[in-house]
């Protein structure tokens, strides 16, 4: 199965964000949602949906998202993405390309990815920022169907994230998990946790002092959480990263949604 999702935004004469170009092939679908109380006023809320029960060997998902200048998009997904069992040497693949226009804002938090026994999955995410643009991007991965006693039974997971501005890298994050060859339960790895989450925030309108204050606020929020291991780090330029280990996916997702609201509220783009 080769599936494509293509969407872009535009700004109306009333200053509201709307879908512009929109193309999907099965099993993808996108549904726009009613406006709700949010710090990004006049932004567009949308849900990325899929009718597939999971990814199979040879599946390729191609996602392209483009935000026009001065638009804002909050994009969530409908359900967990499950990578099903497959033969040795087989993989499912996802490629995501995102471009943010000047003064644009994107909040993108897909549901967790679940790696089933004997699965192989490779994903690449490339995001290009523009002047004064803002990004809140999250990823959550489960090491297996934990409630079924499945832990690190997948074959291979590879993830590459690159965020750049004017073709210069701002963030590069690479994950390689090979359970048969790596001690993934050791100290400084997953230890006894079953879910990992990463949330990256980049705002090119913020200076280092402002970002540092936001890091301190999120560290205070992290200290209130139970049954999670949380780290908040300031990026070299214009942003921060939150890394979380936990025993359940939903608590990471709820935390990231809460952090997203905190970060949106401090946006200085009108």
From Swiss-Prot:
Keywords: Chaperone, Cytoplasm, Nickel insertion
Record-level GO cellular component terms: cytoplasm
Transmembrane segments: none
Keyword flag Chaperone: yes
HAMAP family assigned: UreD (MF_01384)
Keyword Oxidoreductase: no
Organism whose genome encodes this protein: Actinobacillus pleuropneumoniae serotype 5b (strain L20)
Protein name in UniProt: Urease accessory protein UreD
Organism phylogeny: Bacteria, Pseudomonadati, Pseudomonadota, Gammaproteobacteria, Pasteurellales
């Amino acid at each position: 199965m080769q599936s494509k999702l293509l969407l872009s935004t535009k700004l109306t004469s009333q200053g509201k964000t709307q879908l512009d170009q929109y193309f999907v092939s099965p099993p993808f679908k996108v549904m726009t949602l009613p406006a709700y109380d949010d710090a990004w006023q006049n932004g567009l809320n949308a849900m990325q949906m899929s009718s597939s029960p999971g990814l199979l060997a040879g599946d390729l998902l191609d996602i392209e998202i483009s935000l026009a200048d001065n638009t804002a998009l909050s994009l969530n997904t409908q359900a967990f993405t499950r990578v099903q069992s497959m033969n040795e040497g087989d993989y499912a693949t996802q490629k995501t390309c995102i471009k943010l226009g000047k003064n644009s804002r994107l909040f993108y938090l897909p549901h967790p990815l679940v790696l089933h026994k004997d699965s192989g999955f490779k994903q690449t995410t490339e995001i290009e920022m523009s002047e004064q643009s803002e990004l809140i991007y999250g990823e959550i991965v489960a090491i297996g169907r934990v409630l079924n006693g499945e832990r690190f039974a997948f074959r291979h997971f590879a993830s590459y994230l690159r965020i750049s501005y004017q073709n210069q890298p701002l963030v590069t994050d690479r994950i390689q998990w090979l359970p048969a060859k790596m001690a993934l339960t050791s100290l400084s790895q997953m230890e006894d946790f079953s879910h990992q989450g990463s949330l990256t925030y980049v705002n090119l309108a913020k200076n280092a002092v402002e970002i540092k204050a936001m890091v301190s606020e999120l560290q205070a929020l992290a200290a209130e959480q139970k049954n999670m291991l949380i780290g908040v780090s300031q990026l070299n330029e214009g942003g921060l990263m939150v890394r979380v280990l936990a025993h359940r996916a939903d608590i990471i997702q709820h935390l990231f949604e809460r952090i997203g609201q905190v970060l949106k509220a401090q946006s200085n783009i009108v």
